[in-house]
Amino acid sequence: MPTISIRGNEMPASPIRKLAPLADAAKQRGVHVFHLNIGQPDLPTPQAAIDAIRNIDRKVLEYSPSAGYRSYREKLVGYYAKFNINLTADDIIITSGGSEAVLFSFLSCLNPGDEIIVPEPAYANYMAFAISAGAKIRTIATTIEEGFSLPKVEKFEELINERTKAILICNPNNPTGYLCTRREMNQIRDLVKKYDLFLFSDEVYREFIYTGSPYISACHLEGIENNVVLIDSVSKRYSECGIRIGALITKNKEIRDAVMKFCQARLSPPLIGQIAAEASLDAPEEYSRETYDEYVERRKCLIDGLNRIPGVYSPIPMGAFYTVAKLPVDDSDKFCAWCLSDFEYEGQTVFMAPASGFYTTPGSGINEVRIAYVLKKEDLTRALFVLQKALEVYPGRTE
């Protein structure tokens, strides 16, 4: 029998989804599972998007242009202008989610064997997309004790060699919630200029910054306009994960031309998703404000609750809607699986993402989990109580 590819064998399992069969089995036993594992917002999608889908009166659901509808891209120009990101519609290519934007960025800019420097912990799918492109992720460590702040520039330079082609950041960060400072962004700019690198910047969570600190986009950095590829998605800011609409943005026409070849090969981004996403830009300001305020309250509920549990520590995330917390356990993969397969408290349990899957360095994150605060506060409070009960009886507790 033929064997599967080396690439298929190397592709990592998602730390976010790999325990889903255990969660499904728990539900079949009648256990209520609090889903803290995945960044699936529970807040309503803008009514304008729902109405736009309901009111579709097309006779044919045709292919859209490979770059996405121009009307949508032109409206996005106005959206980004609110963040002092000055674009034209031609700078924007609509993709099937932010994931496709990352993949097409890698495929268009990197050769097999090229290296990307990424602070870790990092969004696990970056590793999968790098494998798909034949590229190699080189990670630079950040630590929970230092709030996951970026290391000194010298640490980046230690990793740069003749194969280094790019730096990838997620700002605000998934999974940690860390927000890069202006100084850190300027240091990254200087590295990109000095070594003539690409800068891939995943800025999906720009709407969710809780500290009052300024949002510094890679597109704000002077002198590297042609090096920057910005990754975006509507999934989080509009609770539209299922419509699979993202964007790849760059001033570099050579990159855009290369990306368009991959876009043409996959034909078109989702038609109905674009209709919903374009309509979402007409959502009232109250929608964004109420969404933001809700996440502020959930963040406080979660972080305060975590840090009250004996042996648990979480820094305060500055953005996005995740945190990485340290638990008093021997192995978070085992603990998260045990919570689903062997534990329940009053018919309830918790589903978290083991943080080891967000690292490439062996042994890193072994006692950490990523938690998404995408449940209402009452459910978060109950989930924290159930987590505390689980930690009290877990056989591999270390404290």
Language model: regions and residue ranges:
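Basic nucleic-acid-binding alpha-helical/helix-turn surface characteristic of O6-alkylguanine DNA
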Residues: 59
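PLP-dependent class I/II
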Residues: 2-4, 8-14, 19-34, 38-56, ...
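Conserved N-terminal alpha-helix of the aminotransferase class I/II PLP-enzyme fold
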Residues: 63-96
